[in-house]
Amino acid sequence: AALAARQGDGVFNLTLNQAQITVEGHAQGSLTSAALQSPPTFSKPISAQLLEEALALFGYTHNDLDERIKPAHINGGAGHLVLALNSRAQLKAMHYDQQAGRELMVREGWATILLVWAETEQLFHTRNPFAFGGVYEDPATGAATAALGGYLRDIGWPHGGLIDIIQAEDMGSPSRLRAEIPEQPGSSIRVSGMARTL
């Protein structure tokens, strides 16, 4: 969105760490729409020990997890841990020690820990602790949304080709993102939304 504001509407190629992505920005009156095309996605299970450590960080237990979406390392250009919760209340209650979270995220190479609750098969609520970046919580995380879309495809979730994400509602800065999910395993995910000026 910032590139579009400076250079006009268009598609921009970016290099982030080892990943190549494209971003789009288009002005629509006083608003700007933005979209990113992620690198290839992948996911892998995490160990039982690592899961216990992550649950303890947030004070969650196995009983708080949604068994349909197993905890996993997910990647759509950056690494994330996904923990799917089985209630909106548990998502809202999220709290953690930021320094301990940072140490865990740095050690495991996770940009964020993606906490998610599935309201429906295509509508998800998320929070993204971002201690890795020195921030308690990130209000809009396109990379995590792309990684989640890829993971849902990996596990055969009935996403119908797209999911909508409501993120950071509980921090008073709600964002809405859409991930378009092609059928080909590992293929790029398109994430889009409207940008606000900070």
Residue ranges, per PLM feature:
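Active-site proximal loop and beta-alpha junction motif in alpha/beta enzyme cores
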Residues: 1-198
